A protein has these predicted regions:
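Active-site beta-loop-alpha junctions of metal-dependent nucleic acid enzymes
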Residues: 46-69
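Short helix-terminating capping/connector loops at secondary-structure junctions
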Residues: 70-74
Length: 196
């Protein structure tokens, strides 16, 4: 599941100002897409007003689409980025017995969980240079603790450093950070899942 913002020119229906990273200040539509990733098959696209980019606006359409089909035609797993890992989304999936996997935003509480587990020695290989740990986490706004998978990958290359332009607010390149030999630097990704 994903959302794409489409800037608009002219006077199309539902063309409103909203989150529009490519053309700030332009009216837009948002395309909420549901697709089968493994075979790149789009199963549904909902076109909504440009100020309806959040996943909460797409959820009624998703549930309606699923419930309009026999259970054997349902997807086997819901997967989405950080905007989809909300309490409402997870509760609705759990209510229907539909497994999910969502990436979490690295909020202060998610970062605290990473800090707690950082020094453990039982990280297991997850492929492509990533290592992972299972944990339980209950974030503010969640009704209960849920399983999270914390993934980390060692950074070996120099990193680009960015700043924010004070005039435009845009991200600007400000140089490269060289990594010291003998020190480990990691990037992290945290997933919430109902899978066992």
């Amino acid at each position: 599941m994903d959302a794409t913002v489409k800037p608009l020119y002219g006077h199309q229906q539902e063309a409103v100002l909203g989150y529009n990273p490519g053309k700030p200040g332009r009216p837009s539509h948002v395309y909420h897409c549901y697709f089968v990733a493994a075979i790149r098959l789009v199963i549904e696209v909902e076109v909504q007003a440009g100020n309806r980019t959040a996943s909460q606006y797409a959820q009624p359409g998703l549930w309606s689409w699923l419930e309009g089909r026999p259970r054997e035609q349902w997807l086997h797993l819901l997967r989405g980025d950080i905007s989809w890992g909300t309490e409402r989304m997870m509760q609705e999936a759990e209510k229907r017995g539909l497994p999910y996997l969502f990436k979490l935003k690295k909020t202060a509480n998610v970062n605290r969980q990473i800090e707690k587990l950082w020094g453990r020695q039982d990280w297991v290989s997850a492929g492509a240079g990533w290592h992972g740990l299972n944990s339980k986490l209950q974030l503010t706004g969640w009704s209960r603790a849920r399983r999270v998978v914390i993934l980390r990958r060692r950074i070996r290359e120099p990193l680009a450093v960015s700043d924010q332009d004070t005039n435009t607010g845009q991200q600007v390149f400000s140089g490269m950070a060289e990594l010291k030999h003998g020190r480990d630097f990691y990037e992290y990704s945290v997933l919430v899942t109902s899978l066992g």
